[in-house]
């Protein structure tokens, strides 16, 4: 089975196709930005992009990404190793505290901004409705996404 994860081609042996995708990414590829939160696709901690769409993968298996392009938070950085402008905006606007929800929030926002380069605050809120944060509240997160949207134009 073949897939692309963070812009790199991966061949995955058949014996791993039934493995939970979160386990494969975390344990086999050391992509620990993918979190196991609620295990019910409700909190957004397990969010990644699959073919540029946000997917909650806590119930997915490796076979679900065959021939797909997968992006985790580790694949967001720029080619020179610096943070993506959206990641930097989360830092600059104080949208990170404990960090558990941050990868899912950033990837959900990235998918939104890829499809809508100038979302309204209400559109940002709606996009984040399945991402839970217990620390920051959402004001700083929305501010960060709004500020970063200029980099998507």
Walk through the language-model features, giving the residues of each.
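Signature of N-terminal electron-transfer/Fe-S-associated modules in redox systems
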Residues: 1-153
């Amino acid at each position: 089975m073949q897939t692309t994860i963070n812009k790199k081609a991966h061949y995955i042996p058949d014996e791993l196709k039934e493995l939970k995708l979160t386990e494969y990414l975390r344990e086999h590829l050391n992509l620990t930005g993918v979190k196991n939160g609620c295990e019910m696709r409700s909190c957004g901690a397990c969010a990644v992009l699959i073919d540029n769409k946000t997917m909650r993968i806590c119930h997915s298996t490796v076979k679900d990404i065959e021939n797909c392009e997968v992006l985790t938070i580790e694949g967001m950085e720029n080619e020179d190793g610096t943070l993506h402008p959206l990641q930097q905006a989360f830092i600059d606007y104080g949208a990170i505290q404990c960090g558990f929800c941050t990868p899912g929030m950033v990837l959900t926002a990235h998918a939104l901004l890829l499809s809508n380069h100038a979302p309204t605050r209400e559109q940002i809120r709606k996009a984040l409705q399945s991402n839970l944060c217990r620390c920051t509240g959402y004001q700083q997160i929305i501010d960060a996404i709004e500020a970063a949207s200029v980099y998507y134009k």
